[in-house]
């Protein structure tokens, strides 16, 4: 899968960007203010009478009349309904809602879909994400791994390709340290010249390595490159007495070493190409890399297998490779997986048990396992199991600093006191008691901010979890209980006496918290906000909490209670939620049926909209309420994204809007077809009129015809391999439909669920 750092209109030129802004401004002024801002439509519903019995099943479906019910359910329990989803629920008969929901609660029973097959193919591009954390860190070394290898604390890898990767990053680290030292010693000295200006024949830094990894012998391409350089420098001798042209003029005709190097490398077969790059000397690689043009970068990796592509990205930036693959797989799961409820709940729990991506150098690597092995498998299971798994997760232990927490009266602390008294204290002292995890465990993970605990309870909980740490985190180790750092003695938490029992103290406390009525209400409130409304009816939350307690925290039972409630199906709950940026981006990709071979534009879109994946700094996670996401700037970003997505301005994401079954020729017909496809519940007359107004052909304003308000699709149909078979009329039709689709995807109705 290709990676790109492109922004929204990454394939558009300057005029295209200006047109994007123009049409966005027009539509935002016409459509959005007041339609998405919180108002009566989003206020809390009046709870039903207390004696109103809760239904035992979801509403029955009536052929031809139940699509609004199906769409409401799918809009809440998936990342946006697709025609395939709607047809699947219809096919299940009158009890289709309950049957579909039961299947979603048991993902292993769901038949493999076309989307699942696409997902499997896309995920195969990321073999690194299947590795355990320790192997992932070895294969894609973090900065700490490189520093330890440079300092001789870790051995260099035996694998010749990995050795080359480590050698490059060690050299980069040592160069950076040398520059820093030089700057400190000579603060007024001029900066050293860039390595790019040096000759490719300059002496490389010497790095010892395994004997089986010598520098490769020159390939045939290398010899041809040398011959080309010699030929270029010796051709056309000048007659005596003739003044030669200036060097700059000569270089304009003569190919540079770097250009010849790029051409020779690109001409190699895939495996040899990777080998040649990995064993370049630093200066040569810098020249090669800086001379690559965008088309050549695509050519460089287009026929490599996944392992070869990962080797090259590892050579450039190992941690960035892990982060990009982690973010890409998340979006691909959300877009393509048929296990939609599991993916929605995975997002909810990743946000509930938030871990910040950039906490330290190891966190990106641990997040791979955190999502893969902790959150997704338990997303529909038992809450206590999920709570324990997150508490023991290295990602959480590192993020909230519990891995460094040491009891003040622990064995480790007492030994440190003895060493200090004897004048033998080490350079570092135990960090002491850390209350971060204890506080967030009660406030954010279980009881809630008004859960009835005190600061003294926080301190006692912190003592319970002393010794819960990570075994050599810089090497990717797992959970470890360190008895020497655990605080001895009994603890008293909210009236519960916890006897001294080592690691089991923490398990006992987690059981108490997971089965607390306060936790049941807090989790039920959060789920009701996510699936019903920003201000869910208290009666519904109370019933969900009762189910939570009676089922001992079975998440599936709580969700069923919500599905079977009158409040979930109330008319004022329909379309009452505003999509978060993640929900909006993914639902647009699903609705468009986009073929995604490069997820980076979607990742960039989320960054632009203020919801970067895994990058919420505070432990609270992102808000699920409208007031956090509805603003003029946010709506402009969404409209820009919708237009860019629909008109194929994103590299590696393609949509098709004109089909043989819907050959609409007028804007009105196209709008009708696309509205039924993208927003089956329909749009308002105001929205429809605004869309058609922008889609209508505009007469010339003067002697020279005005350019289109919105440009044609960004992949230039005339340059496609099949351009000869594409008529100008069909191209114009596709452009018109793409523009209309983009306007609908940016409409207020599409931004609701």
Predicted regions and their residues:
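Flexible, low-complexity segments enriched for small/polar residues
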Residues: 47-64, 71-85, 103, 111, ...
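N-terminal secretory signal peptides that target proteins for export/translocation
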Residues: 1-20
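Bacterial N-terminal signal peptides
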Residues: 25-39
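Soluble non-cytosolic domains of exported or imported proteins
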Residues: 60-68, 77-80, 84, 91-95, ...
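Active-site substrate-binding loop specific to GH73 endo-beta-N-acetylglucosaminidase modules
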Residues: 204, 209-211, 236, 257, ...
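N-terminal accessory alpha/beta regions
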Residues: 83-348, 352, 357-362, 366-369, ...
